[in-house]
Amino acid sequence: MLGNKMLSLPEQQPTLKIINSALVDLPVPANISIWWNFGSLLGLCLLIQIVIGLFLAMHYTAWVELAFSSVANICRDVNYGWLLRTVHANGASFFFICIYFHIGRGMYYGSFHYFETWMTGIALLFLVMAAAFLGYVLPWGQMSFWGATVITNLVSAVPYIGNDVVQWLWGGFAVDNPTLTRFFTFHFLIPFLVAGLTMIHLLFLHQSGSNNPLGINANLDKLPFHPYFTIKDTVGFMVLIFFLVTLSLTSPYLLGDPDNFIPANPLVTPAHIQPEWYFLFAYAILRSIPNKLGGVIALVSSILILVSLPFTFKPKFRGLEFYSVAQPLFWSWVSVFLLLTWIGARPVEDPYNFLGQILTCAYFSYFVFTPIVINLNDKIV
């Protein structure tokens, strides 16, 4: 009798019913591959970042005279503070690795045809990028200060209102204490907005159902999410945590910038100002345009162009796996993305400038030529 009551408990309680339908009894295509693991890995990354961020915020001081010292204090005097800081910093890198794999899978298998899910995903990408940029400023090292100065100053390229908006962002006529205070405020707030928008993202996904590698209706071959896919996701969690902890314990500052170990000094400019490695592709696109406003437009377009995919890609088959001509274009685009990341970390001189301009053209060309190639292929078929 008690067993029957326990079994029916998720059906009786409204909250448990929602959780049960989303995480236990959710019908999932049986043939989804490991590429579908990255959504759950992103959820894990977000949870790790929020929890560790809360503990770091307890010890951080958002004041230009004390910010750098407070980060040093966290690493030296707070119990396991060094581990919290390095896992938080490297966790951001793993977050973006999972994001880029997640987006790449969506592009390859045609998940962008789920319009609402894709658009909320792009909004999530912008929010996560904003949070990561703001977090990069908080240690108040040399690269933090000059990165904040250079990137926010790009807003001044907007006609008429640009300079006023920059001063509003800075809270004055230069990057100073008001800037750091508001950056910390928004860095603390945005992850909770990301968590809320993630719920909406999942709501749209569960309305349409998940895509699958074949891109066909899988209603006849679906399994409950638990236990098969919970075990698959748990394996992914273990692998991610293993690599994150290993990196944080063996080479914690490998993905950081050495200049950030120097306190911020407005009078000394670093030899090469650059953002975090996961923004370097966009930074290379920005640098490849000689005009300031044109560079800003190209920078924003490098992400915003993902919005065009549901409108320009109208194939007979959902994914690229059935288009042998389009597959080389996709993997060439992935190579261009990686090369742009490398170019973004190089000095602003030839041949890197010239290579960056060629790669920028190649980056945007994918979104123009691939739909044309697919349409021609469909007509031949």
From Swiss-Prot:
Binding site for heme b b566: H102, H201
Gene3D superfamilies listed in its UniProt record: Cytochrome Bc1 Complex, Chain C (1.20.810.10)
Biological process terms in GO annotation: mitochondrial electron transport, ubiquinol to cytochrome c
GO CC terms, sorted: mitochondrial inner membrane; respiratory chain complex III
Superkingdom, taxonomy of origin: Eukaryota
Coiled coil: none
Molecular-function annotations in GO: metal ion binding; ubiquinol-cytochrome-c reductase activity
Family annotation (SUPFAM superfamilies): a domain/subunit of cytochrome bc1 complex (Ubiquinol-cytochrome c reductase), Transmembrane di-heme cytochromes
Needed cofactors: heme b
Family per record: Belongs to the cytochrome b family.
Assembly behavior: The main subunits of complex b-c1 are: cytochrome b, cytochrome c1 and the Rieske protein.
Protein name: Cytochrome b
Organism listed in the record: Artemia franciscana (Brine shrimp)
